[in-house]
């Protein structure tokens, strides 16, 4: 089939298109030589949110006497601002209204979060039987129709379970998966997952999932035709934390090629899944590339004629900034260099041990390439949440990464007996904190609690979460 939309496209022109549409300030948009202001995402907390979170924290920790409390009373806990999740959904709908979000349940499977997202019209990306069952258990009307089983390599029993629950949309990237679907779920709608260039992403997925165009066209489509399966469209994922958004352009371009092949073979593809990996801080750039590529390769005329819809699988975009983790300092060990707080000295004065770490809710440090910022919550029986947040906002708003305020340097360690359980090799705190004080970590809603373990028997189970809503009047 002749692909007239991309045939003989000069590489220089392509690069100029990309530069023109994406390598510009997030605060401006240039169209036909005219520059206008575009949406800027505000990822800072409002004063109302800060006050609500501080009050919630204060009410909880004021009941805890770390010297006399019962075991686990002083455990780490989360505060979740549901208003921040509402803001995330609103921003998505304002900037990418043509793309229906399917929240990646694996990112944070908190039932309250899932319910809130459902009420806001968000659907769900599930990767296992348990995730499917969790969404189905929430009492959402026609929940099975709002799930994509987005795992290209599935257990046979899970496929049968999806069929039993009428979850009828999934992804594949190999012929062997087609045989399983033909046997256990023959009426399931299939998206072929393409491999992408995610070399600039912090969390790369193409080393594990996705097929190239040749495999999709030469192997998967013919076999799906032979087996009588419903090929419903294309899926891809460019990885999380990407900085080069040209990979989105290329993936959508490849998707159009595959759509054309599907149409030429008699399939009726209706869905393009552009995956996840979106972050609020870079959403103006990534979303702009999505819109540009969709306009170029899936123009309105083509999409309307073939009734094509677009979906995505955002996870961290929706929940990362909504969660604050509060941890307790359970031990301190002063080092021989203690007391030297010269700002040029990069040696910690003491080691702090907290009751959460990389085997718990801070596993994102190891497995998600995150470096969560730590702040002082209490010291000498005083609460510093608002003060710390206001200082942080001031630094961010002034675009000043060189905080000249004197501080105390510590290394911070989790509670397990593993030397790998290091939260921070060097953290600069505003106070000389002691055993019994509390610390807090901001923006830890994504890939944290969902991957915590019970290593060393130090976890008492699900971490307590307190809820506020800064979006309420």
From Swiss-Prot:
Homodimer. Only the dimer is catalytically active, as the active sites are constructed of residues from both monomers. Substrate binds at residues 367-368, 418. Belongs to the Orn/Lys/Arg decarboxylase class-II family. GO terms for molecular function: ornithine decarboxylase activity. It is an enzyme of class 4 (lyase). This is Ornithine decarboxylase. Inhibited by antizyme (AZ) OAZ1 in response to polyamine levels. AZ inhibits the assembly of the functional homodimer by binding to ODC monomers and targeting them for ubiquitin-independent proteolytic destruction by the 26S proteasome. It is found in: Cytoplasm. Pathway: Amine and polyamine biosynthesis; putrescine biosynthesis via L-ornithine pathway; putrescine from L-ornithine: step 1/1. The modification N6-(pyridoxal phosphate)lysine is found at residue 106. Its cofactor is pyridoxal 5'-phosphate. It comes from Candida albicans (strain SC5314 / ATCC MYA-2876). One of its GO terms (cellular component) is cytoplasm. The record marks 237 as: Stacks against the aromatic ring of pyridoxal phosphate and stabilizes reaction intermediates.
